[in-house]
Regions:
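Polytopic transmembrane helical bundles with strong interfacial aromatic enrichment
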Residues: 1-247, 253-345
Length: 345
């Protein structure tokens, strides 16, 4: 255990921000617990009115916590990149997170919590348009899940920080990813098939997600909305895989360079931040709208779903289009400067 790591500004700020999200979601969860136990729209007592006001406070806390959690994800990636200068051999954030078994677990928990919080925040935005309290209990249950998720995230971040040895000689991404890169970079065999599958799958899945989102925005029916959400969820892993296997090599013009952390470096204008951000925004909007459609079982909720779905699904489509354009730019640039030559031949 390396308590001295707590003196590192990047680590200290990361843990402090994580504690803020835990407190925000924990406070919102207290109200959610009271709602599950005592909320009854048929009652008109002072206690019921107080619960309704507290529900609005809970929504505000979740929204603020979501903003902090998403910013925390970006900050975690940035902190990993900055800490790479303190570890010999680590050329980017990959070497930092790989230096301890807790690194990627912590990063995964931060990303998962950010997406979950984003979806719940979308549901609160939908609930604000519903002229009834039909979603009070489902939202209370969803909010109760955010507190333990953020606590797990903070615990893993603390384990990562306290087990990180800044005095070791770490391996850079090119060394750790050589086995993968050697296969993927080749023009033939399993590696090339994996890259082609990821790239083609991403293009098809994103196109399908955009088409379904625009169709659902034009005609907001539950079935189409849920299908658009499902397409967005399917496109997510394909988009991430294609970013690593196809986009990253073209950014650096090196076929075996498949490190997503290097896409966050200033030397490539930090293209990874808007690219991954657009993918994340599309998934959050899609899932939030899809779950909202599934929860719309009353006339009040269905009436509010139409304008909400139109707005959010257009945002989802534009986010996927932005991600596709950002991913295509390095590939198009390489095709121009190389005279149309393939990077992988």
């Amino acid at each position: 255990m390396h308590l001295v790591n707590l003196l590192e500004p990047w680590i200290l700020l990361r843990l402090a921000a994580g504690a803020v999200t835990v407190l925000l979601f924990a406070r919102a969860s207290l109200t959610s617990w009271r709602i599950l136990r005592h909320f009854d729209v048929a009652r008109h007592s002072e206690g019921q009115l107080a619960l309704e006001r507290r529900a609005d406070l809970s929504a505000a806390l979740v929204r603020v916590g979501t903003i902090v959690q998403i910013a925390l994800l970006a900050f975690t990636m940035l902190a990993g990149d900055k800490l790479s200068a303190s570890i010999r051999g680590a050329m980017c954030g990959y070497g930092v997170f790989h230096a301890t078994p807790w690194g990627f677990r912590s990063l995964g928990a931060t990303a998962g919590t950010a997406i979950a919080a984003g979806v719940v925040s979308e549901l609160y935005s939908f609930d604000a348009r519903v002229r009834s309290f039909d979603l009070a209990r489902p939202l209370a249950i969803a909010t109760l899940l955010l507190a333990p998720l953020s606590a797990i995230d903070l615990g893993l971040a603390a384990a990562f920080a306290l087990n990180l040895d800044l005095s070791v000689v770490a391996s850079c991404c090119s060394v750790q990813l050589d086995a993968v890169a050697a296969g993927v970079a080749g023009p033939e065999g399993l590696g090339a098939s994996t890259r082609a599958f990821a790239t083609t799958g991403a293009a098809v899945a994103i196109a399908l997600a955009v088409i379904l989102a625009l169709l659902a925005a034009r005609r907001p029916q539950r079935g189409i909305i849920v299908a658009a959400a499902g397409a967005s969820l399917v496109a997510f892993p394909f988009a991430v895989a294609a970013t690593v296997l196809e986009v990253a090599p073209h950014v650096f013009e090196v076929p075996q360079h498949v490190c997503p952390f290097c896409l966050l470096r200033p030397s490539v204008l930090g293209i990874g931040y808007p690219l991954f951000g657009a993918i994340m925004l599309a998934v959050i909007c899609g899932l939030g709208t899809g779950i909202g459609a599934l929860l719309s079982r009353t006339s009040a909720a269905r009436s509010a779903l139409t304008p909400f779905a139109r707005e959010r699904l257009r945002r989802e489509a534009f986010a996927w289009i932005a991600a596709f354009v950002l991913a295509a730019l390095p590939i198009a640039r390489y095709a121009i400067v190389s005279g149309g030559a393939s990077l992988f031949h």
